[in-house]
Amino acid sequence: MSQVTTTDLYEVTMALSYLREDMRGRAAFSLFVRDLPPGRGFLVAAGLEPALDYLSRFRVGRSDVQDFADTLRRPVGDLEPLHGLSFDGEVRAVPEGRIVLAGEPLLEVTAPLPQAQLVETYLLSLLCHQTAVASKAARCVLAAAGRPLVDFSLRRTHGPEAGVQAARLCALVGFAGTSNVAAARRYGIAAAGTMAHAYVEAFGSEEEAFRAFARTHPGPVALLVDTYDTDRGVATAARVFKDLRLGPGCGIRLDSGDLGALARRARTVLDGAGLEEVRIIASGGLDEYGVDRLVREGAPIDAYAVGTKVGTAADAPYLDMAYKLVEYDGRPVMKLSSAKATAPGPKQVFRGPGFRDVVGLAHEDPPGGAEPLLRTVMRGGLRTEPPDTPAAARERFERDLAALPEEARRIERPVPPVPAVSPRLTALTTLVRHRIETRTGAGRTAAG
């Protein structure tokens, strides 16, 4: 399926009309999240890397024009103005891994209007999904308080490619590994895994299964101990570890039941057998809330595997993300509707100490000591720097997380920082609003 035709129909009809009307001036669009979902104190910017790949390859080919014509049930000649359209614009963006807040642009596109319009849907689809999942995974990292996390989400994500990206996003915020082989290969993430209950069930006994697995995979192994009776499974695993002289690097996995109580009993059995170095790994419907509860109760769990709820960002599976025109042909524009008003002009986010962020105009000088977050990552349709890596994004995330106020880091009832608006952006917003209301009477209509 062509990435060009992976779009909403109205992007095509608008772009065609722009071309017919010779509206090819440069347009600036801003992509941002209006409000944070409940239970979120921050977001993690993600999706920029695949977005830049998409833009660098974007070109409307003959087959795309034919598909558009067939969809609209119009002669292919009517859609001919779209043929050959490619992206040669500029992109400024917040790098992946940076923590961002509501109302702050994650990405701004400046390009001829038809181009900038046609890429809207694909960009929103990428950044909305990936920022939501990265933000969920980041909260798991907070909850784990330094304990390793492994991504187990592939089988429950919204499609195979979503699972590959979920693994990348988990690595981006500090997960130690993934069960996803494709993601491990593509992004250089450590692969990790144990066994399924089916493996144990296929053998005549649990012990036979454990011994066979250890024979097949010399070295450290992790044994799933809850297929039948967890306490007996732990005892069997301990016996196998002792008999085969396994220990350092090995582990047992608990996947059901009262994980805290089971872990405490398992630790007692393992330590009593002289297996203090055998790790306990917990899984089974966990996300930041479950991990936080287990950590707070002091459960002797060494690592956590999280899947379904993280790979789908289950409690906040979407973001109120928008991509809005803020300038056309040098003229700042804005939307006035009361619930979804926008601010005009290309913007920059200036980060001061303690996440005292200010959203201002792109050409403003930063306030003293503040760091501009958006940087130019594409010019003339070409990347300005080499592709980013999950490791580099992880370093940025860890720096931002360390500086994030404690109330925003809370798992329960977090309080996000609220960015300020610069005086110059406030003044421009007032001016543009007045011009629109004078021209259209919108203010009088709303007031009346």
Identify the function of each model-found stretch:
Residues 198-357:
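Glycine-rich phosphate/ribose-binding loops and adjacent secondary-structure elements
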Residues 1-219, 246, 323-448:
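Ordered alpha/beta subdomains of enzyme catalytic regions
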